[in-house]
């Protein structure tokens, strides 16, 4: 009873009463002593008007063993931790939850984030306020013991060693991660010079995931699984293929890159390397952008490649992982952003920050480059190629549409299928309509063969 009254007083911020009742809890039971200790630690945190540097150092002096606690490795065939182990972990988590909330409320967004998340979770919902606060923390010369603890515990990327088949951590500097993060955001915003400036700060050995691993394939006819060792894959920073400037002939995320992506005009730009780091990619885009400003056939091709890049890196594109801080284009939560209303994970702290990725596609950069390419070229084959690329962006806009008429039609989709199709044709098929004028081109026939949407359109409208 006295323990419960002490806890209720704590929640009501009656700290003197909390201390009075806690002093009366004299049971020698391990469970009671553990619960009493939890309330004592929470009381110590609650009494702080602000979590200061001196208090952070004090926390680590008194409670380092609690904060550094990790579950022990279980023996083979044992699947549950002991009650004592669970109590230790619960105590650690309670302390971190309270601290996370306090940091959130006092505006220390960087530490509020790191308490509950590995740094790479920032890629699920990029937030400049958190990024800038982490940048201040990184540049702070006299970090507290608790700040050092957070950086050491959270600035890493959980990975899998495919050779040993064991989980592992990839360690890197906070400054490298933040420069990569900011540079990637700038790249998506077409701020190429700012992106380059950030990428130049990075140790070029930096990476956040493995570049070599097994690819598994299941043969349903033989009912056997095979695995192939692949190397030089995207590792979060390196090995970006030059095909990122190509276009996808077919819609298939799990198909081989060579089967999906075609690369017209790419070999005319020798400065684009076959595999690139983000810095090398940015340098190539800066050069392409310079050429794209002219009014020549070469400029048209440069604009076309840039337009492809910005479509390919939307969540509809084959290389959707690049600007979303993902490892590959598998169907992860960051790419399920159509049809649902995004909800913030919490209004109290940043726990579970990685759930519910929030990426809203912007098709304007791709469309602007492609329209410039269309206006700059006299080549009919290329014009047809560009219209097909524009039609993909137009389809993306259809997915993004918040049109109230369309929303009402979808409320009874089964009965309104014909009306939905008519709405789509009237409002989101202008590039298909224009592409029909290029039926005498080679690329037109290729598009009809590969894209069943377009094939259906040409046969019915």
At which residue positions do the language-model features occur?
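Extracytoplasmic/secretory-pathway proteins
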Residues: 2-461
């Amino acid at each position: 009873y006295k323990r419960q009254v002490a806890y209720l007083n704590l929640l009501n911020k009656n700290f003197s009463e909390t201390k009075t009742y806690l002093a009366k809890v004299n049971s020698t039971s391990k469970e009671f002593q553990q619960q009493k200790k939890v309330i004592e630690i929470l009381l110590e945190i609650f009494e702080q008007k602000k979590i200061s540097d001196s208090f952070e150092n004090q926390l680590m002096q008194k409670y380092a063993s609690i904060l550094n606690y990790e579950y022990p490795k279980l023996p083979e065939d044992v699947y549950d931790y002991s009650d004592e182990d669970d109590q230790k972990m619960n105590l650690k988590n309670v302390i971190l939850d309270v601290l996370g909330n306090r940091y959130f409320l006092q505006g220390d967004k960087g530490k509020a984030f790191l308490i509950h998340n590995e740094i790479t979770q920032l890629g699920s919902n990029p937030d400049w306020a958190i990024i800038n606060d982490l940048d201040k923390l990184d540049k702070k010369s006299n970090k507290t013991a608790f700040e050092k603890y957070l950086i050491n515990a959270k600035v890493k990327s959980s990975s899998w060693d495919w050779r040993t088949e064991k989980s592992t951590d990839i360690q890197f500097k906070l400054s490298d991660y933040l420069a990569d993060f900011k540079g990637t955001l700038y790249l998506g915003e077409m701020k190429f010079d700012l992106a380059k400036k950030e990428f130049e700060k990075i140790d070029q050995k930096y990476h956040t995931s493995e570049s070599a691993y097994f690819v598994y394939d299941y043969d349903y006819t033989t009912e056997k699984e095979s695995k192939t060792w692949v190397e030089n894959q995207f590792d979060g920073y390196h090995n970006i293929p030059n095909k990122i400037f190509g276009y996808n002939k077919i819609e298939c995320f799990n198909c081989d890159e060579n089967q999906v992506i075609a690369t017209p005009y790419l070999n005319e730009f020798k400065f684009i390397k076959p595999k690139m780091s983000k810095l090398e990619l940015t340098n190539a885009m800066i050069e392409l952008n310079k050429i794209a400003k002219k009014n020549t056939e070469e400029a048209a091709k440069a604009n076309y490649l840039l337009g492809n890049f910005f479509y390919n890196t939307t969540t509809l594109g084959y290389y959707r992982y690049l600007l979303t801080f993902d490892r590959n284009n598998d169907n992860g939560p960051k790419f399920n952003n159509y049809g649902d209303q995004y909800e913030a994970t919490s209004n109290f702290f940043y726990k579970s920050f990685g759930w519910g990725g929030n990426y809203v596609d912007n098709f304007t950069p791709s469309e602007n480059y492609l329209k410039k390419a269309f206006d700059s070229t006299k080549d009919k084959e290329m014009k047809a190629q560009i219209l097909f690329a524009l039609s993909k962006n137009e389809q993306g806009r259809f997915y993004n549409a918040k049109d109230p008429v369309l929303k009402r039609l979808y409320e009874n989709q089964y009965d309104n299928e014909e009306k939905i199709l008519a709405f789509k044709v009237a409002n989101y098929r202008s590039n298909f309509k224009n592409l029909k004028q290029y039926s005498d081109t080679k690329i037109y026939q290729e598009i009809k063969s590969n894209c069943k949407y377009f094939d259906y359109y040409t046969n019915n409208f």
